[in-house]
Structure formats: structure tokens, C-alpha cells
Amino acid sequence: EEVESFDLVILNAGVLGKIKDMQDCSIEELRETMEVNVWSNKWILDTCFSGGRNIKQVIGISSGASLSGSRGWNGYSLSKAALNMLIKLYSGECPSTHFTSFAPGLVDTAMQDYMTNLPEDPRYAPIEILKAAKGTEAMPSGYECAKKLIDAFPSLLENESGGYADIRKL
């Protein structure tokens, strides 16, 4: 049976890549990150909207890294900034759907395990902030974060479609 509409579509594709300077990243590494973090989400949206399906709300899981431009976050920051723009562009094309790029804050995931196990490097200062947050309320488990996100989703409808929100600022 064909689905005619969706109440909520959550786009949660994300790979980090290696923490290193942008000039040390190959185009291929950046392309792979963009493929997962941006283009897979475009494919999902196009598939969901195909056949004239209606969608009430789309939430693209973004990151504070999409705005910060912190050294070392290279393709991840670039791809999450591109995801923010993808969400904004779709919001202009699909005015009956509410779109939000939504940063979940720090979440204790395999990505955090990788970053918090990196050796100290003064070039990548934000890593030390993550290390300090690991194992505290500032970095909840995926399950705890999911509960907070689900509770926050309805309030995002009050914001302008196509915008960016960070759970830490709600």
C-alpha cells in the first residue's frame, strides 16, 4: 500500500571523518562526507515528496559545527552547513511543509568516542571541551537525547520554516 503523507520526516545521516586541517583533506574524503551528510538526505526528501505526498514537518539533524567553523572539523562542518542550506532551499519550494535544521547538542555516540580518544592537540581546542563533557549530563546518551529531541519537535513548528535551531537554546 502506497503511503500518501508523512507527519514527520527526520533526516539523521552523519559521518564525521578525521579531525585534521582542511588543507590536509582530500577532495575524495570531503566528497564521501558530503555524500552521506547532504546528498543522502536530498535523496530521502525527493523520495518522500515523490508522487505528490504531503509532509507536515521535516527535521534535518544538523550540528553546532555547521556554524562554528572550528579548526579540524573540515568536511563535517562543511556538510552540516550545506545541510542547513538544503533545508532552507526545500522550505522555499515546499511551503506546506515545515522544515528545520536542528542541532541536538552533544550526544554520547561512537563519534564522540573517536573524538574524546584523540591525543591532546592545541590546534583542535574544542576536542578538550568534548572530553570534559563525556560522562556528564552535558553529553547525554543517544537514548536520553532522543527523548529530549522528540519532546522538542512540536515547538520547532513555531519557528520560521527553513531555519536553524539548537536544542541548547530552546
Regions found by a protein language model. Give the residues of each.
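Conserved internal alpha-helix within the Rossmann fold of NAD(P)-dependent oxidoreductases
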Residues: 40-45, 67, 149
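Catalytic Tyr-X3-Lys loop
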Residues: 23-42, 83
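A short, exposed helix-loop element centered on a Lys and neighboring polar residues
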Residues: 45-46, 88
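Rossmann-fold scaffold of SDR-type NAD(P)-dependent oxidoreductases
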Residues: 6-14, 37, 60, 100
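Catalytic loop of short-chain dehydrogenase/reductase
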Residues: 57-92, 103-107, 113-116
